[in-house]
Amino acid sequence: MAGFFSLGHGGGGNTPDNHRTNTNNPSSSGTESWLWCRNPNSNADGGEAGPSYKGTLELWQHPNNQEIIFQQQQQQQQRLDLYTSAAGLGVGPSNRSLIETSGGALMMMRSGSGSGGPSCQDCGNQSKKDCSHMRCRTCCKSRGLDCPTHVKSTWVPAAKRRERQQQLSTGQQPQQLGGSVPKRQRERIPARSTSMAYTRIPSNNTSGLEVGNFPPEVSSSAVFRCVRVSSVDDEEEEYAYKTAVSIGGHVFKGVLYDQGPAERSSSGGGSQPLNLITAGPSASSSSPNVSCNNGVVGSTSDHYIDPASLNYPTPINTFMTGTHFFSNSRS
């Protein structure tokens, strides 16, 4: 049986007063008190040792109130450090009072650690600045905590964020929703009449013709090919004739459209004002020397120009300046 003997006072006598058990005997002078402990059972397995050698003497220091308070504070600080390190894994003390009391200390520690804002105690993400539970919106909602700061979501789509960043980088203010955006006006091209406009060069005025070696009037034979054409506005097809002649070393191609009966068109000059082909009696439709075979109108004269022999590239379409646009010829 262990016995405690106080060593706080002087005197080494063997009186019964000095051998009484003392468990709470602080020194009167305020200094540390020591206890002398005798444990007779410590050498019970010591073999054949004599009874006078059984037992040991130990010195125990009696703690005062300040040391007890310091130990309690140190243990609480260790628990707070453990709770802080395990907060990201969702591990923490089960005592709710400890969580509530340590919230203020954790808030001070986190606010002083950096300016990036507090982190969520459950997932480790950034929490709201004004959240009293120090959690993000998802964790507050999943735990069912009554947090007034997480009522409205602050999530913004990535497209709007990029648009706002571009506006801020360029210095442009975001346009209001009700503002009108100016639209580009469509260019309106006036519709051309079905009748072709042309200007006949007078024969007496030869200014500019000598430079290009173009005579004012040409009489030659040509091959007219019958084709079917249709306008953009009107889907009705009509017959026309296209040809190509060589004048002054240049190739001239054109399309002759139907102008009506010969009696009405003869007064207007027929197809001669087009200046594409100014042929003689052999090229006139009323001449008896002209024959039409399988849609091909040709002259009976042996002197004619074959368009294939000119080695001129085939045009993409039959569009000419000053005329209507027609689709590609169909046979």
Curated annotation (Swiss-Prot):
Any one Pfam family match given in the protein's UniProt record, by short name: DUF702
Leader peptide range in chain numbering: none
Position of sequence motif Required for homo- and heterodimerization: 247-250
Residues covered by region (Disordered): 1-50, 158-194, 261-290
GO cellular component: nucleus
Record note on disruption phenotype: High gibberellin (GA) levels associated with dwarfism, short hypocotyl, narrow leaves, reduced apical dominance, and late flowering, but more flowers.
Residues annotated to bind DNA: 120-147
Tissue: Expressed in young organs such as shoot apices and root tips. Present in roots, stems, flowers, leaves, hydathodes and siliques.
Keyword Metal-binding part of the UniProt annotation: yes
GO molecular function list: DNA-binding transcription factor activity; metal ion binding; protein heterodimerization activity; transcription cis-regulatory region binding
InterPro entries, A to Z: SHI (IPR007818), SHI_C (IPR006511), Znf_LRP1 (IPR006510)
Compartment list: Nucleus
Record-stated family: Belongs to the SHI protein family.
PANTHER family for the chain: PROTEIN LATERAL ROOT PRIMORDIUM 1, PROTEIN SHORT INTERNODES
Protein task: Transcription activator that binds DNA on 5'-ACTCTAC-3' and promotes auxin homeostasis-regulating gene expression (e.g. YUC genes), as well as genes affecting stamen development, cell expansion and timing of flowering. Synergistically with other SHI-related proteins, regulates gynoecium, stamen and leaf development in a dose-dependent manner, controlling apical-basal patterning. Promotes style and stigma formation, and influences vascular development during gynoecium development. May also have a role in the formation and/or maintenance of the shoot apical meristem (SAM).
Quaternary structure (record): Forms a heterodimer with LRP1.
Protein name (database record): Protein SHORT INTERNODES
Organism: Arabidopsis thaliana (Mouse-ear cress)
